A protein has these predicted regions:
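Substrate-binding cleft of secreted/luminal carbohydrate-active enzymes
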Residues: 312-313, 317-327, 346-404
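Short, acidic/polar
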Residues: 10-24, 139-152, 294-310, 326-330, ...
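Polysaccharide-binding and catalytic clefts of secreted carbohydrate-active enzymes
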Residues: 129-275, 290-292, 298-305
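Glycine-rich, aromatic-flanked loop segments that form ligand/cofactor-binding clefts
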Residues: 31-56, 83-127, 160-170
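Substrate-binding cleft/loops of secretory-pathway carbohydrate-active enzymes
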Residues: 171, 278-324
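The substrate-binding groove and active-site-proximal loops of carbohydrate-active enzymes
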Residues: 2-12, 65-84, 128-143, 254-264, ...
Length: 404
């Protein structure tokens, strides 16, 4: 199976051994961040630092001044990695080590953008804004995201891209000193708290024949037993989550939300993919980080499998965990694949972040039986030496057919 490792530019810039170390894992490709959200990242082998703090979402290359001149929404530049173009410097080093470089572009996830432009943020049923989550129904947000996708994806030398958060973002977010766990929000509760009631979304609901204010009140009513501790609004698996949403809201109201959000997300994906392809040379591969439950949001956006595979060249799917986790996400895409479709199983290989590098060979083999033809490894820069040793062993087993 073809394998690619996720990498940040700061893992490579300033470390002359990094590119060769990654190539020696046995991967054929790296997925290198070109536009990324704020984070605090470990760099356990870098000669100059151990922690990198990316203070806000930024592009890791020099943005095109002409593209963004005079626009209110535009990408921020980074200042925490030395040099004007850390992406380009890292990409060159990785390519010199024999690795194929693809870009990693985070789109609808940008806390600084929402803080500085509060009108663009998702606004929940209570009127609270989520600055990390730009509302993808808003025309100015869509224009920004589509142009960012084209610019950040098609970097010099890149052979393809992976678009993360190309759709709705909502409540779920690794926020600063988070303290929202007082009421257990299951999947259905997360969905209700992620529904947007900004002006654009309100107009969208009205356009479907619904009363936006009545919908908002219905969401507030549905969540009352959650805050009272009477229900966790869970639902279990993906199908159970949606059944719980319909139970809490009523099927008709749930259908309005689904129709609006699915339409918005699908059209954004289509526009972003088209913009990337227009900016790229032929055979430039466009993948989307995705989840087969359309109601889900976040880094792995919820999609309809048939719809997304008609738009993009493939998907990257969350496959960390046991066999049940993989069985839930891979099979829904298999009937809709073509000969060129990529179904990439994404595995966390950092033990401290919930990964299991020791079982990677077995887990990847299971994913292959379910239809995956590539794997992704999160993350070559964050993993410990011990974790990387386990990855090397696993990739050797997979390449020689010894994985069970």
């Amino acid at each position: 199976m073809r394998a690619s490792a996720f990498v940040y530019p700061w893992d490579v810039v300033g470390d002359p051994d990094a590119a060769r170390r990654i190539a020696d894992l046995g991967v054929q490709q790296v997925t290198l961040a070109s536009a990324y959200h704020s984070t605090r990242a470990l760099t356990p082998r870098h000669p100059d630092h151990r922690i990198v703090t990316a203070r806000h979402a930024a592009v890791l290359y020099p943005p095109d001044a002409g593209r963004w001149q005079g626009r209110e929404l535009r990408p921020y530049r980074q200042s925490w990695v030395p040099g004007d173009d850390p992406y380009g410097e890292a990409a060159a080093a990785l390519a010199d080590a024999g690795l194929e470089v693809h870009t990693w572009v985070v789109l609808a996830h940008n806390s600084r953008l929402g803080e500085e432009h509060p009108s663009i943020a998702v606004r929940n049923a209570y009127g609270d804004r989520y600055p990390w989550a730009p509302c993808v129904a808003r025309p100015e947000v869509r224009a920004y995201l589509v142009d960012l996708a084209a610019e950040a994806a098609v970097r010099p030398g890149a052979k393809g891209t992976e678009l993360e958060s190309c759709g709705w973002y909502g409540l779920a977010h690794l926020h600063a000193h988070d303290k929202i766990g007082g009421a257990p929000l299951g999947g259905a509760g997360q969905y209700l708290m992620s529904l947007c009631f900004c002006d654009s979304c309100g107009a969208g609901y009205e356009g479907l024949g619904a009363d936006a204010e009545e919908l908002r009140r219905a969401v507030v009513r549905a969540l009352r037993p959650v805050w009272a501790g009477e229900t966790a609004a869970g639902g279990g698996d993906r199908a159970g989550e949606w059944a719980e949403v319909e139970k809490l809201l009523g099927a008709d109201r749930a259908a309005v939300f689904a129709a609006w959000r699915d339409r918005v997300a699908s059209s954004l994906r289509a526009e972003a993919v088209a913009a990337v392809r227009a900016a790229a040379e032929t055979d430039f591969r466009v993948l989307l980080h995705a989840d087969p439950a359309p109601h889900r949001s976040g880094a792995n956006v919820g999609v309809d499998p048939a719809d997304v595979l008609a738009q993009a060249d493939g998907v990257v799917l969350p496959c960390t965990g046991g066999e049940a986790a993989r069985s839930a996400v891979l099979p829904p895409f298999v009937p809709h694949r073509s000969e060129r479709t990529v179904l990439a199983a994404n595995f966390t290989v950092v033990t401290g972040m919930g990964g299991s590098p020791a079982t990677l060979a077995r887990d990847a083999a299971h994913a292959a039986r379910l239809g995956a033809d590539e794997i992704r490894l999160y993350h070559a820069g964050l993993a410990s030496d011990q974790d990387l040793a386990a990855v090397r062993t696993a990739l050797t087993e997979l390449s020689t057919g010894r994985a069970g």
